[in-house]
Amino acid sequence: MEQYKRDFIEFALSRNVLKFGEFTLKSGRKSPYFFNAGLFNTGADLARLGEFYAAAIQASAVDFDVVFGPAYKGIPIGTSVSVALFNRYGIDKPVCFNRKEVKDHGEGGNLIGSPLQGKILLVDDVITAGTAIRESMELISANQAELAAVLIALNRKERGKGELSAIQEVERDYQCQVLSIIDLDDLMQFIEQDPRYSSHLPEMRAYRAEFGV
């Protein structure tokens, strides 16, 4: 596992963004872990978070023109990612985000920041049902732009209601890569190697066996 992945897991644990235990998800599933990126909520947290996204971008070598953060959670992520890309790697990319309510005065429209043009890197925290991605694709298509890739913090790698995960459905429907800072396999490897968390292994393995893709 790359060092930035291990560091990100440690960071998420230290902020209680990532927890092990027993949690009931919105789907009703009982999960042995929970991830809530909304708890990255200070200036220092967002600065570090942006650096982890930037590290994943560099590792993937994805080719893109604009960073797009869909409302609402994607807005601070997109901003912190674009700042981190410049500060850490000297890469200066435009950033764009949308408002969910179309504004009919002032600058109008539903996009703020850079025009949505060229190859778009969409950044968000997680993909649960893929709804935000589908809404974003309508915006991207309406602006004659192209989705280069999606980058999220965590890929749970678990099935939705069918045989595919929401992420696999997005990849199939939009012919794009979905990248992540970490995924379930990284989490499994981390707890296998860390005695602080190894007691959660049986539940994690059982969960992956039942719901994993």
Swiss-Prot record:
Positions of 5-phospho-alpha-D-ribose 1-diphosphate binding: 26, 72-73, 99-100, 103, 105, 124-132
Record: residues binding orotate: F34, F35, T128, R156
Named cofactor requirement(s): Mg(2+)
InterPro entries reported for this sequence: OPRT, Or_phspho_trans_dom, PRibTrfase_dom, PRTase-like
Enzyme Commission (EC) number: 2.4.2.10
Keywords: Glycosyltransferase, Magnesium, Pyrimidine biosynthesis, Transferase
Catalytic activity reported: orotidine 5'-phosphate + diphosphate = orotate + 5-phospho-alpha-D-ribose 1-diphosphate
Family recorded in the similarity comment: Belongs to the purine/pyrimidine phosphoribosyltransferase family. PyrE subfamily.
Protein purpose: Catalyzes the transfer of a ribosyl phosphate group from 5-phosphoribose 1-diphosphate to orotate, leading to the formation of orotidine monophosphate (OMP).
Protein name: Orotate phosphoribosyltransferase
Organism placement in taxonomy: Bacteria, Pseudomonadati, Pseudomonadota, Gammaproteobacteria, Pasteurellales
